[in-house]
Amino acid sequence: MTSEPSTSSEAGSSSLLDADKTNLLQEALVRAGVIRSQRQGISPTATNIKSPKKSALFEKIASHPLMPIVELLLEKCETAATTFDRKAFETDDIKRLFQSLEQRGVQLSSNRDEVDELMETAILALRTCMVELERVYSLMESFKAKYLATLRRTVCHEALVGNNGDSDDELSDNPLMPVLEMSEAAFQAQNKAMESALATLQSVSGSLSLPLQFTHQSITAAQIERNLEFLKQCGFPTQLPPNFLKPSNEKSPEKSEEEKSQKPSSSPKSPSLSD
């Protein structure tokens, strides 16, 4: 029964110690900024130092050998979180700082205290933040690449097919206007492209791609005369050459299938035999 209060008190004291360490680290960073601004000739900001004991801890943390690494990691985390620049995730400057500390012979004290553990924990936490920010940056770059690829495919599809596609809801007033406004060279190029297009035929086993060749059908004079009004509405030249229909009238071409269906031939009557 007596062990439970002791464990709860130990947990509470450990949480208080962690909170105190965090506050001490924050205040030490502020103190380090004040010292750095004093060295650079900048007016320092006011800091609240409540007791000589805390002042001694501030000085100890600010003058710790690992304090420059903590400041550099904090600066890199802030730059990476605000700008997402690729250079912010490089660790060459951190390696150079470690090498410079080793060359100057800076080492931790043999008897490790809470300040040493606090600085090492801060470095590990900041390095973990850098790794997580780099993962977010990689995911963002991957999403941007996939989105741009999809956008390029969509733009190419709209440039080839059109933004209306096959929808019947958004029909223009005159669907033939884009065709009529095309130049002759562009119209011929489009015809050549259509002749070499591929038509997908649906079969039982699957889809089969076959070249679709558009065969040129001969148009009779009767069809031209019947569709002359439609050609005028579409904007085609209405003035035909004077001898355009003459050869066809002289040759008396065969009637089209449509004319045959409209005017069925009547069976000739057999001559009556005289009695």
Curated annotation (Swiss-Prot):
Protein name: Transcriptional coregulator psa-3
Keywords recorded for this protein, A-Z: Nucleus, Transcription, Transcription regulation
Compositionally biased region (Basic and acidic residues): 248-262
Coiled-coil stretches: none
UniProt subcellular location: Nucleus
Disrupted-gene phenotype: RNAi-mediated knockdown results in absence of phasmid socket cells.
Any single Pfam family the record assigns to this protein: Meis_PKNOX_N
Chief localisation class: nucleus
Cellular component terms per the entry's GO annotation: nucleus
Subunit and interaction comment: Interacts with homeobox protein ceh-20; the interaction is direct, facilitates nuclear localization of ceh-20 and may stabilize interaction of a ceh-20-nob-1 complex with DNA.
Gene source species: Caenorhabditis elegans
Top-level division of the source organism's lineage: Eukaryota
A Gene Ontology molecular function term of the record: transcription coactivator binding
Residue stretches of biased makeup (Low complexity): 263-275
Region: Disordered, residue numbers: 239-275
Protein's job: Probable transcription coregulator. Required for asymmetric cell divisions of the T hypodermal cells, and cell fate determination, in concert with homeobox proteins nob-1 and ceh-20. Acts downstream of the Wnt signaling pathway, and of ceh-20 and nob-1.
